[in-house]
């Protein structure tokens, strides 16, 4: 079982569209760029331990705060499209060239969309717990899951979270609660209050369109990707993830998909060892 590794990485910045965008990095070698999700408190800090592990394995491991999250500046428009488009803009601003994307939660959909549109920019895609890339079990399930997520986001927008509120949110997304160290808890809470909380509230009323240029669900387009794809999910993740992974695997037995036991939605934490073990040979292929 994964154990938390305490790291402190230097905050660095690039400028994107006039916004100061913060990132963290460690190591040298091929670039593995970690992308955080959209929940309240999400930031590059989610991957601090993963970055240290991948750096030790011979990669230049990086993560950045999407504008409107973490320590990055707040954009005038906090749309889904703007969040997605910040990824190639960051890659260009940091002068990274071709990169592998390690995408958690909603950013998994971003990674697939970007890779479909500009395949020459991305060497590999690793998806970590992205429910938006799994087929529904029945016709109405996708809509129900989206409504449930919207309700959860709206509830989190009702009041600024206390430290204990943040602990409960993390406990809901992790199987191994011992991974929620006091340091991780304080960092997550600090990324959930003040301007970050106001940004979260603003995102609830921002236009949510523009995430995909086609009406075809992304899970139906995974086989169109021109680069290697690997998907890792937690067996205990929400929204029937394990059953939907099994459904996708039955439809496409050739796909590189893994289910990790004793793991919920925070795959980078619960499955840190497995993510490293599976990803290193995959990224070197």
Residue ranges: model-predicted function:
Residues 159-223:
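Conserved alpha/beta-hydrolase catalytic His-Asp/Glu region
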Residues 112, 116, 125-162, 168:
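Flexible "cap/lid" loop of the alpha/beta hydrolase fold
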Residues 253-285:
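Catalytic active-site module of serine/aspartate enzymes centered on a nucleophile-bearing elbow/loop
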């Amino acid at each position: 079982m994964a154990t938390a590794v305490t790291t402190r990485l230097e905050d660095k910045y690039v400028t994107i569209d006039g916004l100061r965008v913060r990132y963290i990095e460690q190591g040298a070698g091929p670039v593995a760029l970690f992308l955080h999700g959209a929940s309240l408190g999400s930031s590059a800090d989610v991957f601090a331990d993963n970055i240290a592990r991948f750096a030790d394995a011979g990669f230049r491991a990086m993560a950045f705060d999407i504008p409107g999250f973490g320590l990055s500046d707040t954009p005038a428009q906090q749309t889904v499209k703007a969040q997605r488009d910040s990824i190639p803009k960051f890659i260009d601003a940091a002068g990274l060239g071709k990169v592998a994307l390690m995408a958690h939660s909603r950013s998994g959909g971003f990674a697939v969309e970007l890779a479909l549109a500009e395949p020459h920019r991305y060497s590999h895609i690793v998806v970590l717990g992205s429910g938006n890339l799994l087929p529904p079990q029945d016709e109405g399930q996708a809509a129900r899951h989206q409504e449930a997520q919207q309700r959860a986001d709206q509830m989190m927008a009702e009041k600024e979270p206390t430290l204990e509120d943040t602990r409960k949110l993390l406990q809901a997304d992790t199987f191994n609660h011992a991974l929620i160290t006091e340091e991780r808890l304080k960092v997550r809470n600090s990324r959930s209050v003040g301007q970050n909380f106001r940004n979260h509230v603003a995102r609830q009323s921002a236009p949510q369109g523009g995430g995909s240029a086609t009406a075809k669900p992304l899970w139906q387009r995974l086989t169109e990707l021109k680069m290697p794809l690997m998907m890792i999910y937690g067996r205990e993740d929400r929204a029937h993830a394990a059953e939907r992974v099994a459904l996708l695997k039955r439809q496409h037995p050739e796909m590189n998909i893994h289910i990790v036991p004793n793991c919920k939605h925070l795959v980078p934490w619960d499955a840190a060892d497995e993510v490293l073990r599976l990803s290193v040979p995959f990224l070197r292929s």
